[in-house]
Amino acid sequence: MELSAAAGRRRQAPWREFTGRHRTERSQERGSTPRKERSMGSRQPRKREREPRDCTPTCTNAASVSRSGARRAPGCAGRCITMKNCARAWRELSERACCFQAVPPSNMKQSWLIFLDTTLCSAWLLASSCPRLYAPLISFHCMCFNTVLLFPRLFGPTLSAKIQFNTDLSLRAIAWKCTKDTTTYC
């Protein structure tokens, strides 16, 4: 028993030595830095200037289609909305409403949106009766056209809507699908 305990101590020793040395080196480096350099910044209050909104779309790539025919959304469209960051998501959505003024690429006219959360479903249905409200729903996901925009399942059935961009930049839904489990109701 004594032999195995000694072997165990010997095995742990190099790690303890390394971590101990690493800690002392870091603390010495920190101590050598003059206090003024370490200050967090000036204490003067910042002037609050209204920054112009950035309304440029961050991505315009189309979703790639695999050989089996299944659509795959690009990375930029896979923003994860959970209950935790739902409020932030809606804030971003409303802030990006101005992005609708950006002209979509001429070769990309349609987009499938998939909503798995009933809150988003109701927002979409509300938007369908008011064309101006389409804008934030589209621009929220980086203005990605011809893509399947996926929201993770929170609860309820899946509502899909195919959106078409008209030449005058207005939008309209040209197809609807509602899926529950494996059944699709068109």
From Swiss-Prot:
Any GO BP annotation: DNA-templated transcription
Please list where the region (Disordered) is annotated. Answer: 1-62
Q: Where is the composition biased (Basic and acidic residues)?
A: 18-40
Task: State the conditions that upregulate or repress this gene.
Answer: Up-regulated upon activation of cAMP signaling.
Q: What does this protein do?
A: May play a role in cAMP-mediated gene transcription.
Name of this chain's protein: Putative transcriptional regulator encoded by LINC00473
Q: Which organism is the protein's source?
A: Homo sapiens (Human)
